[in-house]
């Protein structure tokens, strides 16, 4: 019977392979690797020393992370290969269900830049979310990539080194030991349990985190145990949820743990003080591997004595096993491609989009790309794959999919020194049919409040026809040369019909028709400022826009380019504006990242907006200020040094340069300079207004969005100002 490789994490892995271990007349040696999440990285260092000591290994048994390391070792991965592999992984990504930003569609990228969390709801979401916070598909797909050739359900005793792993059946609390199959398990409460027959299986660390008894039952006469568990904590150290939960788990299996300790011949206890199951940072991984080596070296005399007990000469070295031929660029010959849970229309599109062809060689990277596309562009809730061997050679590629979530609740929240607090709430519902449709409702609360409804349908993947309506109440202070000039309150109505097409995953093009109504209240002017003669304004406009995006991160990117361009033609009756020719607006923005070193980057940018026509209405005048496009007004362009909104002339061009230094892993120091040209007409751009501004800022890249504080100066305002932002920008 075959079982898909499902959720893996700092969890336990049981894998599949074949070959037969060769028995000998000497005593059999079993290596036992305990669980411990990230602390299990120390097993790699310990295995290096055991190998260098010339100890033959006949059995490997592991729990949790110990089963991941032990499973890979048993199929031929060397400690050196595993050392290199774990160091280059992005563990924060692997231990999540995130889709790589490079594979996300444009809508998902925009959502990831606004919402703190997303919560699925509906029939599908209820059944899929029960039992854990994360499904673990990214680690599952990595494990599939690492074990090509061993995806069939087989006997683990026929691996190059016989292997077993431990899990717990939470139906009855019994320990379940796996010696065959294709299975991955989960950390209780974090990764979703695996259901097998009548069992519900989770991480075996709760019942047997140091499974010496399993190795003995397999035939091991001598046990080398590597233990990366924390010692039991005294009362004064049990002061957090994590420490209390860890203590409870350790206490549950304490009696069996003590018994297994007595059955250990060479005990390698790793010093993991200061580290937890979640310590997956590069520096932590490096330290834990080194501590594993040091702990094993401290038992060198015991290893020498063990070798003598085996009757082996001090110069004896076991014959090396064939190393596993891993390469992320490896290609495999695929005979058949099958799917569980994929719509036929989506299947045809995916095969064409990813260039997946039967009876051809396909790279593992291409397969990984296909799984990401299934979860992004086609919006399946999870996608994993396996590669069972095909009759006559080669492999069959089999994708396992979960249905799309029907509904999602998205929430965003932010605080800043201009608007204090703002809350963004969105509900999106997907309707599956011959033509997929989406209904989205969005509300914003704060000083400026808004409501928006979007309805769209996809006649083909990545092609969308959309209808939208938005109401927004605005209360905006306008400034002139750094001093408040007037306040404007108004109600804004938007109706839109659009067609958008994603030509490639990084490029989106859209065209459409908009209706806009600006319903102004009376303006409040500061003394000495001239008034605008503004009544209700409305527009029918035609627009075309393009968005190109390759940033690796929405905030604090380290590579890539972001570019936007748009053209709008404004009328009040579809053909003219105010009984004369329509006016138009051209807007462009381009920013890139030049990585100078691993920590230092330069971010040049150029952007502008140009109005063409006469008698430009107040609602469409150019505006600048703030640190993000469209902050208060759709046409607003950012300018460091001006924190508020300032109206400018019809032609506005801005150049910007940022110098960014990363400190630690999530802290950033940014120096910014920008220069602006503004004129009544484009041809006068070099002759009229010039402005410059600069700023220095600190940023923290947090799970709740960027936390930023900056000091800024601009010659137009001729004053130093401070700006603070906490959270995603919307």
Features from the language model and the residues they span:
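Secondary-structure transition into beta-strands, especially the periplasmic turns and strand N-termini
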Residues: 507, 598-600, 667
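C-terminal hydrophobic structural anchor segments
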Residues: 658-691
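Patatin-like phospholipase
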Residues: 21-63, 71-372, 376-389, 393-395, ...
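Gram-negative/organellar outer-membrane beta-barrel architecture
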Residues: 365, 382-551, 555, 624-638, ...
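N-terminal signal peptide c-region/cleavage motif recognized by signal peptidases
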Residues: 16-18
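C-terminal outer-membrane beta-barrel translocator/porin domains of Gram-negative envelope proteins
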Residues: 408-413, 543-547, 551-663
